Each structure stands twice: as structure tokens, then as C-alpha cells.
Amino acid sequence: FVLDKGPLIVLDTAIVKGNAKISETYLFNYLSLKPGSAFNESQYKKISLKLKELPFVAEARPFEIEYMPGLARPVFYLQNKKASQFNGVVGVQPDNANAGKVYVTGDVKLRLHNAFGRAELFDLNWNNPLPRTQDLKVKMSYPFILGLPFGIDFDLTLFKKDTIFLEINRQLGFRYLLAGNNSIRVFAGKKTN
């Protein structure tokens, strides 16, 4: 009995067809594919499931593999999904404590996900319901820095009431990115009152 393993086939670059704005580096890292490595068909069985987990792209049709002598090239058919949002109301009201003055009031929510094609996230929530009161929450996240399985994120929370109370929370985190959307996070934070 003789086992013929056949020729070595290595993974080549990917082709993304469709209107999806996504970096090939991010896509390969997210799907745990490494260009230049030996092609392993079992890696491709879960790709469609992994792509469904992404909030900003959808498969227009199942991916295909193009074979060339010694190379395998995945072809993805991806469409953008709306993952970013903006919601807000801003107004001006008279300030009863200071005659003739006004203050800005409002509630604004802005979420930008994958705006630059690298799966980055920017999230801002601002709320100013009363005079001299501010509530601000900002989150930023950037995965796969320099194509490595590491990401960085930053959180800022600010709450101000009048001139007597100010609370600021800051947090800087580093993530080791695992398969799918899972990660291990290490962070440092500072809280001031």
C-alpha cells in the first residue's frame, strides 16, 4: 500500500469581491489563515460561520478556492453591512441661573465600526440633560496591530455635575486576540474624583 500525498499547495493571498471595505490582513488574521503556509482544507470548513459573526460584512455568496500550480487562493464575496450609527438631538435652553445666557443640551450617540476597513471601533455617547451637567463615554478599539494578534483599546468616562463634582475614568487595554471575536485583555485604569 503506497500513499501518494500529492504536490505541496500553499496558501496565497485572498481576493475580496463585492463592496466590502475590509483589509486583507485583518481578514486573514480574523480567519486564522496564514499566507505562505501549507493549504489545509479543514481550515475552510468554519469560514462562513466566522464571517457571520462580523457585524460589518456579510457573504453575498459562499467563498471559493482558486487552485493554481502549487497555490490555493481564497475568493471571498463580501458585502458591507450597516454597523455604524448616529443618533442625536442637540438643543439650546435658557440658563435660569444666569440671566441672558443659554446652555447646550442634548443626547448624542455615535458608533463607527469598520469605517477604515480594519474592524476598528469608535463609540461616543454624550448626554447633557441639565445645566452644568455632562455625561460622556468614549470607547475606541483597534485589532490586529501591525498584522499581529494583538489589539489596543481605550475607554474614557466623564461625569460632571455642577462645579463641585467631576469623575473621570480612563482605561487603556491590550488584547491578545483568539479565534473569532474572543480575546484575553490586560488593562490599566485610573479614576479621579
Show which residues each predicted segment covers.
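Gram-negative/organellar outer-membrane beta-barrel architecture
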Residues: 21, 37-193
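N-terminal periplasmic "start-of-domain" segments of outer-membrane beta-barrel proteins
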Residues: 21-35
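Post-signal-peptide, soluble extracytosolic/periplasmic N-terminal scaffold domains
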Residues: 1-2
